[in-house]
């Protein structure tokens, strides 16, 4: 069973920005990127605790996890709240691994 999911408004902009860049590189590549992001989100919603811990609170509890996208150097970072998965950021893992950590909710 999968958790319902939403994207933080800035995560939506993350996807759009990367989609535009990939589309400029090669038509259709942006669409493949969006499919890869969607697949990562579905994986996370099915197995929310399987993602790699990404951010911890002051007590050492996992606050956010991350899952890589297949075929692209991007990952999604998400948190699980109230039986829902919230995608907080979609980011390039090599360029800015701490991108979006200041997004609270």
Per-region residue spans from a language model:
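Basic, Lys/Arg-enriched alpha-helical interface segments
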Residues: 1-64, 81-84, 98-105
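Enriched for short, Lys/Arg-rich terminal
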Residues: 69-105
């Amino acid at each position: 069973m999968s958790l319902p999911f939403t994207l933080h408004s800035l995560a939506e902009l993350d996807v759009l920005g990367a989609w535009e860049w990939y589309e400029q590189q090669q038509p259709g590549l942006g669409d493949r990127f969006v499919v890869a992001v969607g697949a990562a989100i579905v994986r996370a919603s099915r197995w929310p605790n399987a993602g790699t811990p990404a951010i911890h609170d002051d007590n050492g509890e996992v606050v956010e996890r991350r899952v890589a996208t297949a075929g692209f150097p991007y990952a999604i970072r998400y948190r699980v709240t109230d039986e829902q998965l919230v995608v907080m950021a979609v980011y390039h893992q090599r360029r800015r691994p701490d991108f979006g950590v200041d997004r609270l909710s």
